[in-house]
């Protein structure tokens, strides 16, 4: 079979028969990859954990700006509630906030009601009021579609979590309090975070 000019110029021979992972690279790229692998330790052999950021299922309700955070805290009835609530609302770095070797924090906060923490929403009435302002049906984790005042409202995906909790359990929430490397999912700028940001 005759090969096209493009295949003749750009084609690369690859061995897919081995048990090692394969990748299609030019000979120069293959050489660079082999040199890196010869001196480096594969990521799978490092003693680290790799996690994804927080999935809320509805960022409009759970990710808030400084003004909204202050309003929620101002609506707390006691100093004890205010302190609890302030600990629950944590700074977050979103993927779009990460730049090459740094970040530009957008003054955003996450209402960090992780299911693995087993929060009692009744201890956070100001947060409860804020979340309910988006409609309980919208925040439920049933996957159902509701019709309210002629408008179709889609609930978050079905889970066993409560309506006020983030979508994923985040059992590794304590690791957000450790230094970590953070990167977005669309492109690869990395930043080393020692400020205990949550990420999404």
Model regions: which residues?
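Polybasic, glycine- and aromatic-enriched phosphate-binding surface used to engage nucleic acids
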Residues: 3-200
């Amino acid at each position: 079979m005759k090969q096209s000019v493009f295949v003749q110029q750009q084609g690369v021979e690859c061995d897919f028969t081995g048990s090692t992972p394969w990748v299609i690279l030019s000979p120069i790229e293959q050489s660079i990859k082999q040199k890196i692998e010869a001196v480096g330790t594969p990521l799978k052999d490092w003693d680290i954990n790799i996690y994804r950021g927080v999935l809320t299922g509805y960022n409009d309700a759970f990710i808030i700006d400084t003004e909204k955070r202050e309003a929620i805290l101002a609506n707390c009835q006691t100093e004890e509630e205010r302190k609890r609530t302030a600990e629950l609302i944590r700074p977050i770095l979103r993927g779009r906030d990460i730049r090459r070797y740094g970040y530009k924090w957008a003054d955003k906060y996450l209402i960090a009601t992780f299911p693995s923490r087993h929060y009692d929403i009744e201890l956070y009435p100001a947060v409860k009021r804020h979340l309910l302002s988006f409609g309980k049906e919208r925040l439920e984790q049933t996957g159902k579609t509701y019709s309210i005042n002629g408008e179709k409202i889609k609930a978050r995906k079905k889970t066993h979590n409560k309506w006020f909790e983030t979508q994923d359990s985040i059992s590794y929430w304590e690791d957000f309090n450790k230094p970590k490397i953070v990167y977005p999912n669309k492109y690869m700028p990395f930043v080393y975070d020692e400020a205990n940001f949550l990420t999404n």
